[in-house]
Every structure is written in structure tokens, then in C-alpha cells.
Amino acid sequence: MEPSPASGGSETTRLVSPRDRSSAGGGLRLKSLFTEPSEPLPEGPKLEGMAFHHCHKNRVSQSGLSPERAQARRQLYAACVVCFIFMAGEVVGGYLAHSLAIMTDAAHLLADIGSMMASLFSLWLSTRPATRTMTFGWHRSETLGALASVVSLWIVTGILLYLAFLRLLHSDYHIEAGAMLLTASIAVCANMIMAFVLHQTGAPHSHGPRGAEYAPLEEGHGHPLSLGNTSVRAAFVHVLGDLLQSLGVLAASILIYFKPQYKVADPISTFLFSICALGSTAPTLRDVLLVLMEGAPRSVEFEPVRDTLLSVPGVRATHDLHLWALTLTYHVASAHLAIDSTADPEAILAEASSRLYSRFGFSSCTLQVEKYRSEMAHCLRCREPPKA
């Protein structure tokens, strides 16, 4: 295994087949990128990936966090403070109003605090350097934090749905409509503030050094869509669900304030908007489970990556192409490239790496270069995987 620089400052690893090193008759001889070749390269089209930079150049702050992760940490800290203050107010207001809907909102805020604290811990853990055991570092801890955030909300919501169902069956409860209206109004303001804090409009992305995280490419578009840190995304979805519920609670409190006989609006609003909160977290849960199952990122399809590699001059075939992700924004690829015996392996490696980084935003690529053999066309292990 030999390191090879690639454009964009991302990490690239070159694997050279031993049989290609020792092939008789002048087999593949890899020319060093750091010394002048003994003889000039043959004339041919200039490859766009021939300009290199050192493979470990990146933009990481002294604290070990990339700018995007440092921003995510600040957002989560601010949201935690706002969430705790207004959660305490909702607990008091819900107790005074005897409102299950208000207590439901407070419970969701409590779940948000717990999930954001878990996200902050996972952000800290992800800055730890890679080890010989954890060779990719601790990036996956961010995904686990997002999973814990979603699961905690589902558990709390399930309990509150059960309590709301009991209130629909039994009407022996009283609600202080004035206290409920005031608390619901404050809750709406609190969730709007948290949504503003967590909203990531114009989060930076980079087409240069890969210290900045690439967000998944939006399906059908050619530019990366910056979703920011996974934990902030999960927290933002939480807050959106809470905001919808708070608006529903506010509407119910207005109705109960003017029409006390319609107090059943309290458990009904709890029931309806808890279901909405569950539905709003389903996409995040789906993405997190896909990452944990080592699935290909939803924004990167197999065929375009394969076709990009095959379009490199000198590449005859590709096999063992694998796409996966450590987080929603940290994408990884590996592949074997079978090339012509007369092709320059270094030039092909540079061009293939450059195209993968620039077109798909991979954070890490591992490419193995080997000489093309006719039996590869019939090899069962070299066949493409079937469509899911």
C-alpha cells in the first residue's frame, strides 16, 4: 500500500497488485510523483487530475473541530440554554394549568435537551484521533448520537400518547385555560428561537481542501446541499416538531379559553401533534439506519460513480466498487481499476481520484490499480452487485 496525493486535499490510498509489480516483459512500473521520470511520458491528452496537493492538507481548527463542527457545537450550546429555560417555565405552567398538552410540550423539550447533550458529547468524542483499533476515528459517534436523539423522542411521545388516550376515555379533569394560553404562547416563542438558532442557512461548503465536510448532493442536482452537522440536523427536526405541537397547543388553549366545554381539545391536540412529531423524525431515522447498515449514501448512486471511473482514459474495467458513509456528510469509496498494460498508473490514479472528489465530494477514496486481464469479464467476484 502506498500513499498517493489527490486533488482537493482529501485522503487517497493506492493499492498496487503484487503480480503487477513482478510481471515479466516490463509490467506496470509506477512512477513516483515526487521525482522526475527517467524518460518523458508519452504524448496524450492532459488529465485534469495531474495537479496535486499534499494528501493531509485540511482546514481543522486548533481545537480539533472543523469550522462546521465548531459552528454546530455553538448552536447546540445556545439551543440547550434556551430549551432548559423555557422547559422549566412550561413545567410550572403545565402544572398550574392542569394541561396534559403543556406537559407534553415540556416533555418534548426535556427530550430535546437530553438529545442535544448527547450530540455535544458525540461531537467531542468525534474529535479524538484515529487509533489502530478505531482506524476511522470516532466519526460514527455523531450518527449514534442522532439515533439516540430520535429514539428518546419516540419513547417520550409514546408515553404521552398513552396518557392522551386515557383522557379521551375519561373526562374527570379540569384545565386552567388562562395559564394554559399564556404558557402555550411562551412555548411557541421558545421553539421559534431554538429553530432560528439551529437553522443552518448558508452553511459553508468547499470545493477545495477537504477539511470542510461535504453534504450529500441533492438528487437531480449537481451542487452539494449543505445539511450541516448530523446532530444539528436531528435537533433542528426535533424543534420543528415541537414548534408544530406548540402551535397546536396554542390553538387548543385559545379554544378552551373561550369555550371551556371543549376541554377535550387538550388531549386531542396532544394526540395529533405527537403523531406529527413522530413522522417528522422518520427521515432522520431512515438516514441514520442506512449509515449504520453501511449502505451507499442516498445522494450518491452506484452507476454514476462506476461510469465516472470507466470514463478515465486507460481504464478498461472496474470491480469491487464499494460506497458507504461514516456520517451523513462523510462519504467513502473504494474500487479496483483494471487498466491497459500501456497506461500510466499514476496518471490514471490521479485522474480517477480527482473526478471522484470533485463530482461526488467523497471524504476518502481507496483505489487499487491492476492490469486488465481478459478473464475478468467472466469472473464471478468481479461482477457488479444486483440492484436492491
Swiss-Prot record:
It is found in: Cytoplasmic vesicle, Secretory vesicle, Synaptic vesicle membrane; Synapse, Synaptosome; Late endosome membrane; Lysosome membrane. One of its GO terms (molecular function) is antiporter activity. Zn(2+) binds at residues 108, 112, 238, 242. Gene3D superfamilies: Cation efflux protein transmembrane domain. The chain crosses the membrane at residues 76-96, 106-126, 146-166, 178-198, 236-256, 264-284. Its main location: membrane. The keyword Chaperone does not apply. Probable proton-coupled zinc ion antiporter mediating the import of zinc from cytoplasm into synaptic vesicles and participating to cellular zinc ion homeostasis in the brain. Belongs to the cation diffusion facilitator (CDF) transporter (TC 2.A.4) family. SLC30A subfamily. This is Probable proton-coupled zinc antiporter SLC30A3. It comes from Rattus norvegicus (Rat).
